[in-house]
């Protein structure tokens, strides 16, 4: 499958307990990367949701779009047409994770009942009311929810940090530049279900270990 970057590319679990925050009594938001890393959560990609041409490796911490159909079994939670994959872990409380990428990527969170069979409205990250997505595609950078877009700045690095405070309804994306975090977009809303981190990958993406 040859990818044409200028063409329209279709965009691309068992419930696990989210990592509890270090101290639920805290009400202030983290300020430094070291503060955010206190809420680091170890995530793994769910092979049962991965699009059939996404290859998972490194203990299901890396996803790469390939030209080959992978040997995944049929599964009702698999994305049928989009280059997407969800994590195994459903998150609540305060959580932080980082993603390093090459090529085009969308870094999302979604409810478990996000659609899986088909293309956009019910399945694509950010095109419905069940998912929120930072889209860093080749010629288009935006945040998307319910198919509404907000432009975001060009990231200065290939690593993005995501901070979730589920109870407070806060979702914030950061560009990670060494020890500095540069805000890219912030959401304040009300989350009603566990949130599953997800990736749409036209290139490669890795869930990072804390450093």
Question: Where is each model-derived feature located?
Answer:
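Beta-rich ligand-recognition domains in immune and ubiquitin systems
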Residues: 1-211
